[in-house]
Amino acid sequence: MLNAKRIHFIGIAGTGMSALAYICVERGYEVSGSDIQENISTIRLKSKGVKIYKGHNPENVNNVDLVVISSAIPPDNEEYVYAKERNIPILHRSDLLADLTKEKKSIIVGGAHGKTTTTSMIALVLENNKIDPTILVGGELEDIGGNAKLGNGEYLVAEGDESDGSILKLDPYILVITNIDNDHLDYYKSLEKIKDTFLKVIEKVPKGGFAVLNLDCENVRDIIRKIKNKEYYTYGFSNADFKADNIVLNLSGSEFDVYFRNEKLGRVKLRVPGKHNILNSLSAIAVSKILGLDFETTTKALERFQGVQRRIQLKGIIEDDILVFDDYGHHPTEIKATLETLRLYNRRLVVVFQPHRYTRTYFLSKEIAEALSLGDVIILTEIYSAGEKPIPGVSSKNIYDEIREKYPNLEVYLVDNIIEAASKAKSILKKGDLLLTLGAGNVWKVGEALLARGRKDANLEYSQ
């Protein structure tokens, strides 16, 4: 795979980076990595013999043959600068993943939302059908004990990252597109350019391979009209090749009949809630069916699937029967899907939302406010920058002002940081409420603090 023995990952705690590091370890490379934080992924890598450095230091990249970076690593990172000055080869993580996708028949999942859940479902289906795939997923998948697995089979299952266009580097044998939305506009500038990118990825699917496309997404339908000489299948709730019907939604999941071109394949049960997860499962069923895998084995795998961390995850219950949920959603479409699903509980919905990135807040503050209006009480904390530089005039107050103007009856609070958010949540929660921490940053710490010590005596003096 690589002409190197010792590989160093800058930012190894990231989901994509830690998964690649794990695969490299399993393939016999000597791996090290650095990050400003540790998490469950770095703990797992340590147990595999990976040297993890806390913080960044040029000394960390001494005596390595290759440095791997992601788009989150700034050009002035001291390890990155040191490697460049000494001509140590530097590889972007997308190029490393691209190398892997060339070695196997790769199933790549792309789209604005639902990538991690869909990738996990497909991986679990292949695992249960004894395909033994290599897996790289953007979350913790209990069945493989983490976010990566090196398999001996001919297939690889992974997420494709469209945020910076790097999905175009991958070579999918099977391509799943969950949806297309107006995200990452700081990079693409327009929705049309996003659609063009996905169309180009479809064009890379080789003869014998195929695409699986969400027909319920208008933007996906737009690119379907432009597909030429490629095999593809659609899924959705309407006139798709793979269709869900006779749907029953409940708090613990859903049930539905699945049809392939009007032929009933059978009834499916899911243990993850929400109509969006029905769509995710349909794409996994489509991949399974077209590959000729056993339908009953596939549906049993999907019924066992309990989700991945930070996707409508029930973290626990605190005093006064208050449910604590956490979700990674940060785009308006994701926020809406999560809140609509949690509305099934018929409880007062208290949402602690941490906006993700200044650029996304700049482009989508109105849409975020509209999505959050599905809650009963909203607590807005500071923007999680994800390494971005601040934009003058852009803050959580943009969303706050939108809510106050458009939804004057909605109870909304603006706080400066995570500690204040936890304190505010503690003070306003009532018996029988549902608390949701929402965002791609560290907002989950609010729920953790309340769960650790109880609502009334929570010690909120934890690090941010």
UniProtKB/Swiss-Prot annotation:
Its EC number is 6.3.2.8. It is found in: Cytoplasm. GO terms for cellular component: cytoplasm. Transmembrane segments: none annotated. GO terms for molecular function: ATP binding; UDP-N-acetylmuramate-L-alanine ligase activity. It is an enzyme of class 6 (ligase). Pathway: Cell wall biogenesis; peptidoglycan biosynthesis. Disulfide bonds: none annotated. Keywords: ATP-binding, Cell cycle, Cell division, Cell shape, Cell wall biogenesis/degradation, Cytoplasm, Ligase, Nucleotide-binding, Peptidoglycan synthesis. Its main location: cytoplasm. GO terms for biological process: cell division; cell wall organization; peptidoglycan biosynthetic process; regulation of cell shape. InterPro entries: Mur-like_cat_sf, Mur_ligase_C, Mur_ligase_C_dom_sf, Mur_ligase_cen, Mur_ligase_N, MurCDEF_pg_biosynth, UDP-N-AcMur_Ala_ligase_MurC. It catalyses: UDP-N-acetyl-alpha-D-muramate + L-alanine + ATP = UDP-N-acetyl-alpha-D-muramoyl-L-alanine + ADP + phosphate + H(+). ATP binds at G111, A112, H113, G114, K115, T116, T117. Cell wall formation. Belongs to the MurCDEF family. This is UDP-N-acetylmuramate--L-alanine ligase. It comes from Dictyoglomus turgidum (strain DSM 6724 / Z-1310). The gene is murC.
